[in-house]
Amino acid sequence: MPTSGLSAEVRALVDWSAIDTVLLDMDGTLLDLNFDNHFWQTHLPQRYAEARGLPPGSGREELMARYHARAGTLAWYSVDFWESELELDIMRLKEEVAHLIDIHPHVVKFLEAMRAAGKRVVLATNAHHKSVTLKMAKTGLTPHFDAIVSSHALDAAKEEQAFWQRLRAIEPFDPARTLLVDDSLPVLDSARRYGIAHLVTIRKPDTQKPVKDTGDYPAIDDFSQLMPWRMKGS
């Protein structure tokens, strides 16, 4: 039985006969995190400084402190919050660098394989619905999902137990028969506490940055490693 495309740790974890539901993160998991990192760490600070007549580069330190204060909360992920907080048109600024939005390798084939295998595929993201709309428009991934759920619709970030409780209320799933793929260790920790049995992370969410710490979670370099051999295309 061919298994060369799968790492031993992923082969050991993902028994596809034991999985009914696949929950997928968006930014850093299906999509290259380079867009988000560039936007929040470079582009927005630049535009923020320009809007306030500050010297180039001087706005970054202030924004980094503001980001840090909101990390892991719904506010951090909210376009509306940052538009109010910074008095800037965040979505217009995102459009300026939207050419950086890109799908990670083998994602589309993986999504097609999941549908062919009869798995229920749900995009479960902390991204604000405005960001989701932009990225789905740029990537065309929407038809591959049975449902798209933003944490903002549930009023709880994925780092919180309330997110999983509320998700299950609208999207029934058996935690013991569910796979979550996410690049965020705090989110994976939260899902583990909730009881989601199958957890996989991403080694390189941002293609322009080094491999990240994946903790004790099985990790993939790309989605070709996660596809069961019998589902692989050419």
Model-derived regions: residue spans:
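Asp-based, Mg2+/Mn2+-dependent phosphohydrolase catalytic module
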Residues: 1-20, 112, 128-234
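Ser/Thr-centric signal marking residues that sit
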Residues: 29, 125, 178
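Short, flexible loop segments at the rims of nucleotide/cofactor-binding pockets, characterized by
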Residues: 97-102, 126, 155-158
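Catalytic-core regions built around general acid/base machinery
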Residues: 106-118
